[in-house]
Amino acid sequence: RGLGDVYKRQALITVDKYYDAALQHVRSELIIDGKLSRDNLDKEQHAAHGLSWIAAYRATLKEMVNWAESLDKDSAFNETEQLMLQIIFSEYCAQIKSGIPMSQLEYVRPQDLGLKNGLFQENGTEEFNDLILNGNSADDRMKLAQLLKDGFSSKNFGNSNLDETTSIIRDQFRKFVEDDVTPHAHEWHLKDELIPMQIIEKMSEMGVFGLTIPEEYGGLGMSRFVDCVVTEELARGYIGIGSLGTRGDIAAELLITGGTEDQKLKFLPKIASGETLPCAVLTEPHSGSDMGSFKTRAVANGEHYTITGNKTWVTHGARSDVMMLLARTNPDEKGYKGLSMFLAEKQRGDDDNMFPDDGISGGEIEVLGYRGMKEYEMAFDGFKVKKENLLGEEEGNGFKQMMETFESARIQTAARALGVAQSAFETSMQYAIDRLNVTGQSLYDKPRNASKIVSMATEIMAARQLTYYAAREKDKGHRCDL
């Protein structure tokens, strides 16, 4: 606890200096005559990606301090939370100084960003370096390991700092998951089945699909922050369950930010109630997520647009009722400007007849994981969409409309990852406690095993606080990207 001043006054100051210097270097490499050079961005991919990691570490450490201070005000900053804060600070500061692992074989180090290690030897960094040396000791890790073990039966792995209302909502969805999802999820996965409709209907009754839709359009009007908490609990049971709401989120955000009032009134209440299941039809073969190279065409023809082209990796494509379909309405406009977004209504398919509409064909793409909604490739050959279903009833805005929704979708993706990570953590810990070695000793009693569990717990808490921060920033109307 005595290291609190180090966190706020020294460690973060040093991290800020490092980030500012890294940002200045990357800008000098990428900005030409006041504009981003795409050629230079390709050339300096490592540095640019490294900068994003440094920014994420910096924001995470700041949010961990905010988390700690908030708990402390409520006299809830106990030994578990204190050790988590101390260990994550020590570990992240050490990585910032010596190299952040961006993947198993890729690191970003100060020299990759034009910086020298002398930055970490300047006056005012003594506490930063002392924290690296002394904040993550074996004794402290074993203390936290014991606290986590003591809290295992009650699932007390540190205080996430939720208010009373949000805690009640979380507990409601946790019970739903434990009663209706967890007992069946593995069987759904092994059989590669669509999530049963009765589960979707129960989720509809609980308001999952209308959480963030305004009340005037049939939703609950809750915050992105609450949506994150709910999504984490759903994904903790089964990632497919946690992902179901994302389809509705993308569709709702598109409508709220870019739809006409008639379009909002037509679609939002049905999305909120779960009556209409949306899907996003974006990615194209050989284009990936490079929307500027999309070739699927939408040609105006009387009261309709005629869609022709191919799409792939369409999640929940067969069982959906409306597609958020991105197509090129102006072939003379290269890149992003000629794209338009459509609310393309279709009939709901099933395993026996995936795409019953005229003008659509396709098939399932088998996947190893992330099951429950299934992935599809879809071919459009003269498929008709009503002109009134052009989002915003104005051509050429599709890319802009789509990008306005991606921040919210990525925040929810982070919440899903938290749920999966929490499930993996709890499963790992249960196994380590229960499994005995040949001498009859629990695997958890081996320091190296317990230390891995400690790393999982601290990383998850840190990622959770960063995700909450991004959601709260979005709720305030702020951008939450780099």
Across the structure, where does each feature detected by a protein language model lie?
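Short, small-residue-biased leader/transition segments that mark boundaries at the very start
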Residues: R1-Y7
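A glycine-rich, basic-preceded beta-loop-alpha segment at the flavin cofactor/substrate interface
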Residues: Y19-K43, R348-G363, K374-R410, A424-P447, ...
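C-terminal helix-coil-helix/basic helical segment that borders enzyme active sites and/or dimer interfaces
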Residues: R27-R38, A59-C93, K97-D112, A185-L190, ...
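Alpha-helix capping/hinge segments and adjacent helical runs
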Residues: W67-E69, K73-A76, T80-N161, T165-S167, ...
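Internal helix-loop-helix
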Residues: D74, L162-T166, E205-G274, H316-V322, ...
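A short, Trp-centered hydrophobic/proline-enriched beta-strand micro-motif
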Residues: G274-L282
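A structural signal for short hydrophobic beta-strand segments in well-ordered beta-sheet cores
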Residues: T296-A298
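A short core secondary-structure module
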Residues: H304, T308-D358
